[in-house]
Amino acid sequence: MINHITDNQFKLVSKYQPSGDQPQAIEQLVDNIEGGEKAQILMGATGTGKTYTMSQVISKVNKPTLVIAHNKTLAGQLYGEFKEFFPENAVEYFVSYYDYYQPEAYVPSSDTYIEKDSSVNDEIDKLRHSATSALLERNDVIVVASVSCIYGLGSPKEYADSVVSLRPGLEISRDKLLNDLVDIQFERNDIDFQRGRFRVRGDVVEIFPASRDEHAFRVEFFGDEIDRIREVEALTGQVLGEVDHLAIFPATHFVTNDDHMEVAIAKIQAELEEQLAVFEKEGKLLEAQRLKQRTEYDIEMLREMGYTNGVENYSRHMDGRSEGEPPYTLLDFFPDDFLIMIDESHMTMGQIKGMYNGDRSRKEMLVNYGFRLPSALDNRPLRREEFESHVHQIVYVSATPGDYENEQTETVIEQIIRPTGLLDPEVEVRPTMGQIDDLLGEINARVEKNERTFITTLTKKMAEDLTDYFKEMGIKVKYMHSDIKTLERTEIIRDLRLGVFDVLVGINLLREGIDVPEVSLVAILDADKEGFLRNERGLIQTIGRAARNSEGHVIMYADTVTQSMQRAIDETARRRKIQMAYNEEHGIVPQTIKKEIRDLIAVTKAVAKEEDKEVDINSLNKQERKELVKKLEKQMQEAVEVLDFELAAQIRDMMLEVKALD
């Protein structure tokens, strides 16, 4: 039995008070949620403190909340911020736990079967278990997730029903407890004690929950009764205290009891017979043989071990679902009355829509060629309409909400005023004739004031030619193209901020992490060429790159003013007017954001002999590269321990680059 706490309150801890537009945005959002409104949009300009507003809303409505971001990096940033705002509540992190993932696939044209290959990040797996167990144990939970949250997960009912509940005084034999732990996929290992394992010493059983990384539990027996339960330091065995109740959650999310397993196996066998008959009728004897061999092996593993690699492909039978019925996901672990917040919704909702189709086409190939049963098609992400059916109340958060969000609700709450008093930049349009020389003059003016410039082009060739020309003119310039790896991109941004160079040229400057307060000029070339990066939303987002500097200015080079340009210019001018009026009324002088320049790169390129020396990895010999990989692994673990997953991911990418040279 799980002790589910329902009366905890969210407690927001912050040295800030709501300011600017934040108080009215918070009040409106909270009133609408408490009034039962299903969907609303928080349209917050860049740098207006949207995450703080979200935190205030969560603390006031006091509902379990799912925050979805469109990639792991942003989810990690949000997770860190919410952990700071809610240190006394359960802030959890749920993203894909794969460091590396090659999905199972088949390419008919070359008759190539690609087996599933993956590397699981143990730390993230722990955090996923922490998220699901927290949702079943308490009400004050915020889960920050990527779109992984719409992928199939085991049944929450089976997961909860499988919990092993222990108390001092409970009559249960030691052997019965050991069997119960094995049933929920715990592994006995008396030597290597890790998450998801237990060890036995006489009448003492030590259990290391899947959701922990440092603390384990020592269950002491007296005969066939639990005498006491202690929380201990897993590494040293030091006793931390006694507990009066312990709920051990399964070591995997795909878990089922013996009765359900027998039913599931019978259904898998029946489906196998059906599919074999179909293949034989069509003369597909190779496919039939392939399917029979693989499925019978999986059935044997399920019968003997209760688990097999790829068990998720049989989840429909395990869960007792009908064909085509949506899978259980993280959303099913939440209670009925919960809140969803979609960060950067103009990007995230598009991802949620697209996940199903990509997964379906790959799996159909596996089914058609006898690598999987048709029921594998039901191990999938949710369709968008299935996601919508889980929505009780939702807030879309974006500076530029998409068409989908605007179709869902007419309730749009604006947050335009920045706590720093910074204004949206001035935008002007200049003709393309003589644009490069004109831009050169603007760049030189910024260089004299120790300010930086972003230039965005539409083609790779234009970006390269422009970079070469400016270099010839004596400008310190770099070109950031799509092939640049994560770590190198971080290094480029850091060098730009430090003044190693003054101008950054790129095609897409909307990626996360490219917010540079030192940038006072954004130049948009070919602004009148309609497309993804030159539509209204793309232009507004690009203009926002100059909104962190009090001298922010945007120049669009174009021969005509398109509707997208005009709407972006009008919207920026509207916001700027509101911001100026607010500043004037309250006597606020805009101040450029002061943002610490974190030295990520020196961390990853440190060499043992000279701490601050940076090296070119290509110049290292094999032994030096091996030593560097060891150092990087240690630094990656240190970053993980302080929950800085963004840094950890960047160090990991650096490690992969070093390993690739061997």
Curated annotation (Swiss-Prot):
GO BP term, example: nucleotide-excision repair
InterPro entries the UniProt entry points to: Helicase/UvrB_N (IPR006935), Helicase_ATP-bd (IPR014001), Helicase_C-like (IPR001650), P-loop_NTPase (IPR027417), UVR_dom (IPR001943), UVR_dom_sf (IPR036876), UvrB (IPR004807), UvrB_inter (IPR041471)
Name of the featured protein: UvrABC system protein B
Family, per entry: Belongs to the UvrB family.
Matches recorded under Pfam families: Helicase_C (PF00271), ResIII (PF04851), UVR (PF02151), UvrB (PF12344), UvrB_inter (PF17757)
SUPFAM superfamilies in the record: C-terminal UvrC-binding domain of UvrB (SSF46600), P-loop containing nucleoside triphosphate hydrolases (SSF52540)
Hydrolase recorded as keyword: yes
Subcellular location(s) of the protein: Cytoplasm
GO molecular function: ATP binding; ATP hydrolysis activity; DNA binding; excinuclease ABC activity; helicase activity
Record motif Beta-hairpin, residues: 97-120
Function: The UvrABC repair system catalyzes the recognition and processing of DNA lesions. A damage recognition complex composed of 2 UvrA and 2 UvrB subunits scans DNA for abnormalities. Upon binding of the UvrA(2)B(2) complex to a putative damaged site, the DNA wraps around one UvrB monomer. DNA wrap is dependent on ATP binding by UvrB and probably causes local melting of the DNA helix, facilitating insertion of UvrB beta-hairpin between the DNA strands. Then UvrB probes one DNA strand for the presence of a lesion.
Residue ranges of domain UVR in the record: 626-661
Subunit structure: Forms a heterotetramer with UvrA during the search for lesions. Interacts with UvrC in an incision complex.
Cellular component GO terms, alphabetical: cytoplasm; excinuclease repair complex
Organism: Streptococcus pneumoniae serotype 2 (strain D39 / NCTC 7466)
UniProt keyword list: ATP-binding, Cytoplasm, DNA damage, DNA excision, DNA repair, Excision nuclease, Helicase, Hydrolase, Nucleotide-binding, SOS response
